[in-house]
Each structure stands twice: as structure tokens, then as C-alpha cells.
Amino acid sequence: MKLDDLLGEYYELEQQLADPAVHADQAQARTLAKRYSQLTPIVATYRELNRVESDIETAQELAAEDPSFADEAKQLAAQREELVQRLRTLLIPRDPNDDKDVILEVKAGEGGEESALFASDLVRMYLRYAERQGWKTEIISATHSDLGGYKDITIAIKNRGTVEPGQGVWHRLKFEGGVHRVQRVPVTESQGRIHTSAVGVLVLPEAEEIEVEINESDLRIDVYRSSGPGGQSVNTTDSAVRITHLPTGIVVSCQNEKSQLQNKEQALRVLRARLLAEAQAAAEAEAAAERRSQVRTVDRSERVRTYNFPENRISDHRVGYKAYNLDQVLDGELDGVIQALVDADTKERLEAAQQ
């Protein structure tokens, strides 16, 4: 969308939000306010750019009579370039999911018990990062291994309050999907040999009910008895729920809640996120067939990152990021690697927008 169109949309939204009648429909008012907040940084930067350009003209006129104003004109010109670059960045087409909450799934892969133990390390890393960001977290379902690791776990991570541009859960975590590889000496290794294991991470934008309609007739719902670590029975009732979405074959299970109804609601929540992700992936694939892809898509089956314990090194293979602070990263200090991924994505989006 062109800048003039965005400015027109902003001023129209400003008028709509000033109308008390609009706020009678709270859902509509929230939608309008959200869009207004997205456009506000663009308009503010545009206004600042206009002010600086006006100041440049004045400084140049004064410099023609008094050379002492030449330095001020140069400083203003540099400021204008910064504002132009900022405006270009703000005009990059946004990921429509950037303000969404996230469903994050971590699954042990090759490596057996060691993989499950590393899965628990990754879960702790994401929970600590969420805590640092002030996000809310909720464990939806989990299956433990014999040594207390995770065979699989599903977590909801939610924004808290108003989402600042570039700080939303999806915006920060969307590149975490893929295969995470660990190189270390497992606790089960008696001879001190380094093993390589892998854990799969899937990150989905959480879907609202109005975004994904699920027909009960498309579901097969099975109930069974919940189990804990090592197959221990969690309770004596059939409260665990497994939902199969027949049209797609997607299967979601949940056993963490005490009641069958609660487990069903949580499973449906995960199912909605998976269906939304599948629909968006299909739409992106269709669009890519008609035009060159404007943004890189991450193959969630590829190896994206390696955690090397002997060297205290973390490497992200997509952007060539490397740092020797693995202990800090696993304690939730993820901003370095995440920002490298966000910056690479922003650069590609900017280049695509200029084509």
C-alpha cells in the first residue's frame, strides 16, 4: 500500500475512533484501535520528516547569507536520511501474525532419553525468555520421559497488554521453528563421549475462534486415562482427550487438565492454531506460484540451530550467527540470536518491497 493511502486510512480511523457510536461495538472498536496503533509510527515519522525538510530549507537559506549555518544544514540532512530509512522500514509489508500469541510445541527427536532431556532445557529457555519479556505462559499438555525430560510439550505464550511494534510474541519467536541440535556428553554416557541429539520445535500463531471455524462433525474425539512419567497413572478417570480432525488428519492430544471438558477445550485451541498455520501456508504457496516470494520461508524440518556444550557455543545456520554464551542463552538471554534473525528478515522484506 502506498504512503498516501496509509495516511488517508490513518485520518479516517482517527475520525471513526472519535465517534462515540463506534465504541458501542467493542470488537469493532478494538479492531480499529489496533490498526490505528499500527499506522501511528508511520504517520509520526512522516510528520517528523516533513518538519526536518522544512528546517533544511530554512537552514540553507540562512547559510547563503551566514556560512555558520552550513553545519546545521548538514546535520539536518543526516537526520533526514535516518528518517527516510526509518520510513522505508516502517512501510515494509507487515507479517499479519506479528501481534498474535503463540502455541509452541517441543518434541524430542533422535537421541532417545538425551533428546528428551534437552527438550526440557529448551522449554526452560523459552519460559525464561518469556519471563524476561513480561509474557504470560501456560503449559497446555506434556508427556514426560523416564528421566524427567519431555517427550513432547505444548505451551501457550501470550502477549501482556498492548503490543509494541516489533515486540510481540509471534514477531520474536516465529523463527524458532525447526530442528535444534545439541552436542554434549549425556548424563547417561559413562565414558564421557560427546553425543549429538535433536529436538523439533514448532511455532504456531494462536488462532481466535472467529478466524478458524471447526465443525464438530469433522472431529473424532477419543478419551483415555492420563499417564505421567514412566506410564504412571495421573488419575483414575478417562479425562485425557485425543481429537482427530478428519479432513486434514491432524491429531491433537491433551491430558494436563483435571476434567475431560477442559482437556477438550485446550486440544481445540491447539487444533485451531494448526489449522490456521496450514491455511496460511497454503495461501503463501499459492501466492508464491504466481509471483516471486517476497520473504524467506523457514522449512520447519531443517536444522536451524546447534547448541555445542563443550565450546559453550550457539550457532544459527540460517544467518551465520555464532556466539560463545550458550549458558546465558539457555537461561533465557535469546535476544542476540533472535534479533539477528529479525534483522535478516527485515532486510529481505525491504529488498523485496523495492523490487
From Swiss-Prot:
What does the record give as the function of this protein? Peptide chain release factor 1 directs the termination of translation in response to the peptide chain termination codons UAG and UAA.
Q: Which PANTHER family match?
A: LD18447P
Which residues carry the post-translational modification N5-methylglutamine, per the record? 232
Q: Name one GO molecular function term.
A: translation release factor activity, codon specific
Q: Which PROSITE patterns match?
A: RF_PROK_I
Question: Which spans are transmembrane here?
Answer: none
Pfam families registered for this protein in UniProt: PCRF, RF-1
> Which SMART domains does the entry link to?
PCRF
Look up the domain of life of the source.
Answer: Bacteria
Q: Which gene encodes it?
A: prfA
What name goes with this protein? Peptide chain release factor 1
Protein species of origin: Thermobifida fusca (strain YX)
**Record key words, sorted:** Cytoplasm, Methylation, Protein biosynthesis
Q: How is it modified after translation?
A: Methylated by PrmC. Methylation increases the termination efficiency of RF1.
Task: Report the locations given in the UniProt record.
Answer: Cytoplasm
